[in-house]
Amino acid sequence: MSSVATTTALPRLPHTGKVTQLRVCLSEWTKLRSVRSTRWSMAAAVVFTIGIAALACAVVSHHWPHMSAADRADFHPLEVNLAGVQLAQLAIGVLGVLVITAEYSTGMIRASMTAVPRRLPVLWAKAIVYGLVTLALMIPATLIAFVVGESIFKGRHINIAFSHPGVARAVIGAALYLTVVGLFGLGLGAIVRNTAGGIATFAGIMFVLPPLMNVMPTSWNNAASPYLPLAAGQAIMSITSGNHLRPWVGFALLCGYAAAALAIASILLVRRDT
């Protein structure tokens, strides 16, 4: 009597493939666009950029006949065209914080770090994806804001053209500024790892610290204020000589602040437990 040996086939494990930076970026893109707060915050930033520009330009156009010659001489329409950036940066910065802190609050960050044991590619992917999405939306928004303002001012014969010196740099620079502000918020959020704390830190640095500088001696204020993130970054949107920093120098300094925040976040991400 002979026995027949039987073998049981083992189930094949799914092939997950190598974890690459591109795959991590695609995963972060899926997460970013699936979150409702992303759509609302980005929509708010676009509406603020265009809507406030239209409203501010309309108000100035209405009061233009009653303005003195001195006020008209000091007025530059581009500052009004880009007025919406002041509020849009709040939406962009807060969303930057939420991009990372929302995962900590839900515990989802553990799954992300388990899938990518090296950890750092997750933070890099968030920065890459959020930066590209912000830039892709804000460039059209600032361009539309400029066109809307230009069309309103034409009725008062206030001429401003995209070809004028510094105008193109200021308009495109506004989109670049908002993008880096978002990355700065992302870096702060990754450092704090708490939504309320991250937003408070971002708002404190960007909006509370500059007014507090006014209580310092004038010489100190004049020396330090241009180097704060808000003033330094917005130098790229200025076409007057009032700012102490040159446009690209100020923008480079803001990029340095964002890079420093992301660098500190990277170090802490490797050293701390999730």
Where are these regions (language model features)?
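Secretory targeting signals
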Residues: 2-18, 38, 42-97, 123-191, ...
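A short amphipathic helical element positioned immediately N-terminal to and/or at the very start
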Residues: 21-33
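Generic structural signal for small/hydrophobic residues in well-ordered secondary structure
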Residues: 28, 116-118, 188, 194, ...
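Helix-loop interface residues and adjacent transmembrane-helix termini in multi-pass membrane transporters
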Residues: 33-35, 191-192, 271
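Residues that define the loop-to-transmembrane-helix transition and helix capping
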Residues: 39, 120, 196-197
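Transmembrane helix segments
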Residues: 51, 195-230
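Transmembrane helix boundary and interhelical loop/hinge segments in multi-pass membrane proteins
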Residues: 93-115, 119-120, 127
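Membrane-interface capping segments at transmembrane-helix boundaries
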Residues: 264-274
